[in-house]
Amino acid sequence: MASLTTLKNTAIVTGSFLSGAMITLSTITVPVLLETSTHPPQLLHQWVRTYHYGHISLPTISIATAILYFYIAAYQGAREQPWRKAALVGFLTIVMVPFTWIVMSSTNGMLFGLEAGNRDHSQFFEQGANRSGLKGANSSQSHGLGNVSVGIGVEMATLEGVRELLVRWKWMHLVRSLFPLMAAVLGVGICV
């Protein structure tokens, strides 16, 4: 079994890595997407793929890191040593998961919905629906943030709306990234 010091150091390193990986999504990846994508379906698809790959690894790292901190808290508590700080650090590391469900799910849902709608209807437009006059029927009518109706119940994302949603997501994600960063900073204190 690894020593307690090794577990503490591992938790700090994984938490720091987690926070760094998350912060780069808001400070590098999303800004690059916003600056280089001028076609809403492409921008949405790139965000969905970025989210997919982040979703595979980042929550897992968060949970594994929190488990390390909770183990440290239990170990120290069983030996009548200070344990609350380790438990708090574990909580701060894992709180990004419920933060996503509570704070970000609405924006995530809008982005996923727009991407799915654009994907589902792209074939319709590629097959000549625009040439048949369907797009002009009510193309200026807005139906919520990020999309516009283009006839017969089909909604397509606008670039301005998608960008607005991604900027909102970027800031919420940056806030979410601060939880494991705070945990890593506080985690250093449990190693001394």
Curated annotation (Swiss-Prot):
It holds the Pfam family Anthrone_oxy. It is a multi-pass membrane protein. It catalyses: emodin anthrone + O2 = emodin + H2O + H(+). One of its GO terms (cellular component) is membrane. Pathway: Secondary metabolite biosynthesis. Anthrone oxygenase; part of the gene cluster that mediates the biosynthesis of monodictyphenone, a prenyl xanthone derivative. The pathway begins with the synthesis of atrochrysone thioester by the polyketide synthase (PKS) mdpG. The atrochrysone carboxyl ACP thioesterase mdpF then breaks the thioester bond and releases the atrochrysone carboxylic acid from mdpG. The atrochrysone carboxylic acid is then converted to atrochrysone which is further transformed into emodin anthrone by mdpH-1 and mdpH-2. Belongs to the anthrone oxygenase family. Keywords: Glycoprotein, Membrane, Monooxygenase, Oxidoreductase, Transmembrane, Transmembrane helix. It is an enzyme of class 1 (oxidoreductase). Glycans are attached at N130, N138, N147. It comes from the Eukaryota. GO terms for molecular function: monooxygenase activity. It is found in: Membrane. Its EC number is 1.10.3.-. The keyword Lyase does not apply. This is Anthrone oxygenase. Disruption phenotype: Impairs the production of monodictyphenone, but leads to the accumulation of endocrocin. Its main location: membrane.
